[in-house]
Amino acid sequence: MSWIAPEITRVHPQFAELVGDERSLADAWLDFHRQTLLWKCGGLTAEQLKLRQVAPSNLSLLGLVRHMAEVERDWFRTRFAGERVGYLYCTDDDLTAEFDVETADAESDLATYAREIELVRRTTAGRSLDETFTDPRREVEMSLRWVYSVMIQEYARHNGHADLLRERVDGAVGH
């Protein structure tokens, strides 16, 4: 029997966090978007996750998972925390390699994504949204709040792509 992406249950902040401090709401919305991407992958085979269904784009559901693992690592661990961790899939010569999924191992890539999320949670635990850092690429001061905001919009945008990709794979729709 071939591997199938696990199905997950999402916790929608609209129903779980109606009142809360800014950090709790930011964490809830970021986690919701993380869960949404995995939810869109749930129940699909590795081959289905690799399908590129919206020509001429090279986007696939697995490519989006790999991309978001790279983005999480880059913004939270490399830029914010200053960790010296390399790319997961990309190289300095190919900054979009995460979308090259022909020979990718979907099960391993989803596990890598989950590990990266856990490492990011540890990195940001107890840190103030007001905490600032100098972005090494742009050489400008940024806050953790800004990183949360950009990550929520990044997921929202790519989850829209995931909606279309999933519908093209098997007709499943939903938000």
Go through each PLM region and give its residues.
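Short, contiguous alpha-helical
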Residues: 1-16, 23-94, 135-175
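A short alpha-helix capping/helix-coil boundary motif
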Residues: 15-18, 99
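Active-site rim elements
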Residues: 21-26, 104-107
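Acidic/histidine-rich alpha-helical segments that form the ligand environment
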Residues: 96-132, 145-151
